[in-house]
Amino acid sequence: MSTKTARVQAYFAVAQMNYGEDISLAQVVAVHRGAFSAQITQGSDVKGDVVVAVTLATPGNCTDHPLWPPVVGDWVALADATQNHGEAAAHAVEIMPRTSYIERPAASGFGLSQAIAANVDELVIVEPLQPAFSIGRVERFVAIAHASAIRARVVLTKADLVADQEIQGAIEQCAPLVDSVTALNTTDTQAVAGLKESFTPGDTLVLVGRSGAGKSTLTNALLGTSLATGKVRAADGKGRHTTTSRQLLQGEVNIIDTPGIRALGATPDAEAVDQTFTQIAALAEQCRYRDCSHSGEPGCAVGQALTQGDLSPEVLERYQRMRRESERNELNRDARLARQSQRAASRDNTRGRRETMRLKGRGN
């Protein structure tokens, strides 16, 4: 029995213990506005290929749960699963503990973020070689993977449109950052088959990248599905959002396809940024001052490496920019969470006072 199978069975056992024998266990495969779709795997006759519609506002949902709302990849306990004329419905009572949680920082700089997926094993960064490969975008995605404590790999698409020298240069830039780098043309069946063999069977992957990178085309090739794919403008290489919502597609590996990202903020986890720029992080430990900003301080090992030509100034610039943005996002996030906590406490106090007055016969 695999670790993942054992974990799912443990989830089901806990759900039955908490809610009774009639409970079902399902995995969220898509999230919609005000609802989500889930696929029941255990505990109900409504299972298999049937997708269950779950309305978020249904009474009994776990809206006070710390993990709420559910995201694609979540395992949820469902009650009252029914099927009528091919339409299945249920309501959620609990979100099971997550092994990982990925969120995308907004580019606004206000500490906001958007959930991408949960229970993911590997982040697959799909980066096109044409029209313009961006190592900065790759680095930001890698930092998100570190913040989520999951593996990361890079798939460089449109390799048929650039020279071998450009491909090799991109591979060399990506290789120190991730576990694996592959350059291919997504219509090359042999290359895609080789990529597919490198994935661990049963793993859940999430594909991320800019619009027009080829995420949906790659998903179709890996799973034999038929997601909509869009044309890319010749002028700037930009594509349309052919994937407009996150969805989990199941096969030998489970793939979560996501909408394209036009602008990507820095993760509010500064340590994850350091884990991405390992050369700078290692040099920083040799700096004279612990809080060295690597901006000309005496005894700065990073500055010395820069002077000696052992560190690229472009790499240092990208690191410092992302680190500053990360620290700012962390402060903004913490302030926003503190305000939310204060508002929640105020609401609870108001409810408490009203209940006390009601019990005393003074309320309405």
Give the location of each predicted region.
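Canonical P-loop GTPase G-domain recognition
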Residues: 161-213
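Short aromatic-glycine-enriched beta-strand elements
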Residues: 34-38
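Conserved beta-strand/loop subsegment of P-loop NTPase cores
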Residues: 120-126, 149-159, 179-183
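Conserved Switch II/interswitch segment of TRAFAC-class P-loop GTPases
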Residues: 87, 96-103, 120-137, 160-163
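Switch/coupling subdomain of P-loop NTPase systems
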Residues: 89-91, 111, 118-120, 133-150
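Walker A/P-loop
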Residues: 216
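Helix-rich effector regions associated with P-loop NTPase G domains
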Residues: 3, 17-22, 41-43, 47, ...
